[in-house]
Each structure stands twice: as C-alpha cells, then as structure tokens.
A protein has these predicted regions:
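C-terminal structural segments of small proteins and small subunits
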Residues: 51-84
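Intrinsic-disorder/low-complexity, polar/charged segments enriched in Ser/Thr/Lys/Arg/Asp/Glu/Gln
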Residues: 1-5, 60-62
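Compact, glycine-rich, soluble single-domain proteins
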Residues: 7-53, 57
C-alpha cells in the first residue's frame, strides 16, 4: 500500500474536468485507489465519488493505492492533479 498527502493547487479545486481526468487516470491501473478528505474515503475511479469530496484550493487530500502497480498509480494521480 502506498499513501501520500496532496494539497490541492487548482484555483477552482477538484471540479468536473480535473475530477474526470483524475478518475480516468485511476482507471488505467489495476490497483485499488482511494482518495480521502477529512477522514472520509472515496473510490478514486468514480467521478461521482470524487466530486463528492468537494475539494477546493488549499485542501489537503490523501491518496491511497493498493495493488501490483500501486506506486505507478500514485505517481500518475499526482501528475494528473498537478496538471489540474
């Protein structure tokens, strides 16, 4: 299992387009990916769940991946969020 914290940098937060990109990235990997905000976990491959986070600029979220390609999944998710 790999787990990292990430501070949202996008001015508009994790809104529809970046959330969609985030989910598409998570779907590319076999690992189970979860995103947490305020201790509550959401399936990273579900656009509805990611939008439910309500993550805005400055929020710190936690990314967790578990499986055979967990490190690659985390790296790709961070890269996707950075492009936001």
């Amino acid at each position: 299992m790999v787990e990292v914290s990430y501070k949202i940098k996008n001015e508009e937060g994790l809104h529809a387009r970046p959330a969609s990109d985030f989910c598409k990235t998570a779907e590319r990997f076999k690992s189970d990916s979860t995103v947490f905000k305020d201790g509550e976990g959401f399936e990273a491959k579900s656009i509805l769940m990611v939008l439910c986070l309500g993550a805005v600029k400055g929020d710190v979220i936690k990314l967790r991946a578990e499986g055979e390609d967990e490190q690659q999944a985390i790296d790709a998710l961070i890269e996707t969020l950075d492009k936001g």
